[in-house]
Amino acid sequence: MNFDFSKLLEPQKAHVMKLMDSLYINGTAVDLSETGTGKSYSAAWVAKHFNSPVVVVCPKVVIPNWHNVLKEFGIKAHVVINFEKLTRGNTEHLSFLNGRDNTPDDYQIHFPKNALVIIDECHKCKGFDSKNSDFLIALKKNHYKLLLLSATAATNPLEMKSFGFATTLHNLVSFRSFVFDSGAYTGRFGGYQIDIGSRQAIEAMANIHDKLFNRFKVASRMTRKMFDKIFPDNRVIADVFDMGTNTDKINRIYEIMERELAELEESSSNYSEHHFAIMTKARRKVELLKVPTMVDMIKDLYDEGISPVVFVNFTDTVDAIINQLGKNNTYSQSVARIVGGQSDKARQADITDFQADRKRIMIANLAAGNAGVSLHDLNGNHPRHSILSPSFSAINMLQALGRIHRAEGKTPCVQKVLFAANTIEEDACRRVQAKLNNLESLNDGDLTFSVRVI
């Protein structure tokens, strides 16, 4: 068979053939390419040549992009739908047996039986018993051909219940032994836990990498280095910054947080839920105290002709930054935003204005703007620098790091992960770096224990 590779960049050609081979041999293929290397274009090429009905399940924010990419390849999808709408079970595409959605066996999927189902950002299916996880398991049980896309499919074996089943790492029944063999153990309250920095866990991730890429040949991955001059330079710096007079306030918040957590451990039977609430409350307060530093950095970058992109965790922080910038007309007319609750039209308008350099500052909520959004320099006039407030989620962080560093970017990128100096965040900085390295152990099979800052 003769294949038309004219719409693909050179590194994508061998990559798509590996995906095609795995779909025919394994029934599943996994694209674990780095962000910005063209996973959607590669998937569309595969769909074009696979010659089956095409279903795309993806985050809502990237639905327009999927329609555009499929159209470029002459494909009209059976449906392009977001996870949340689909898994509610009230569309023609999915229903629940007897109105229940307790297990994957309750999921009645109504896609064409010979459909190729593309799951974009498949890390959204990593939950142990989430709806998305059950949906992916149901797809595999119903023998659909699956093309899974994510730069960050999972950080550890506990997140591989559905992913591992789809890629035959386990058969669900063997999931318990799969995670225990990978270094997991039963925690204080009965759930599974794992030390992702342990030698056993790191070796397990390397073994999983070997199975996916070499033994099963179910996965393929493109890196930015493969694209030579197509990608600009990219420097990621995780560092601590002086928060000035707010440093003492930040330390005080963390002291209160630690005391509340200690009291909770002694008194609460529902430790996990309250633990998360206490942590979130403290992080929200601390992030607001970083706003003056972030605003100063934004202004400095803007004045240098750079277009800054700022990723934060809370809408309160987005509002505070925009309010501070709004006090000066130089900056107030140039601010774009990506936040939860924003209409699709307003969000896309701001992204378009930023990409066209009509707006020069982008403030994004990490949860809303970390996946599927392109914010790279298309024109060569205003290099992109990002400022990231750490989320302590390696997946969110790595996805955000791929927003300004993408194929065909015209200028080098600098990305700074912002930690507060002289606080316990100095330890958190090292933990985040460790998580980012552990993601690479899934993608690159890196056995080293080193912390790497690019």
Which residues does each PLM region occupy?
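Conserved two-lobed SF2 helicase motor
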Residues: 76-96, 355-372
